[in-house]
């Protein structure tokens, strides 16, 4: 009686070829500033900081892209709160950094050291001999 299973297992190359052609499913989050961030579908529950504001990957509006040439499927999920977390207890530094005062002297010279032109020629002869 013949075995119902073939003597050789089916080639895995066909499955690998199909997996390579399959588009990567990703999630798009549209931020209030106008930027768009893309995340892998399996990347959920993580946060990121963009332009000083913290965002969650489970944002209010997200889109799932199913393939290269397919139109996106838009989904508006009900908001569970703000996607931007701003804790009022944390002191935020001023985003504008103060610039150093401009000096009148040359920035390339150190005022405590004498100019190299003022050093005697005998010093240089002694130094390099």
From Swiss-Prot:
Zinc finger annotations (unnamed) as residue ranges: 33-50
InterPro entries (alphabetical): Gemini_AL2
Positions with biased composition (Low complexity): 1-12
Domain of life: Viruses
Bias (Polar residues): 99-109
GO annotation (BP), single: symbiont-mediated suppression of host innate immune response
Location of region: Transactivation: 115-129
Record's comment on post-translational modification: Phosphorylated.
Protein name stated in the entry: Transcriptional activator protein
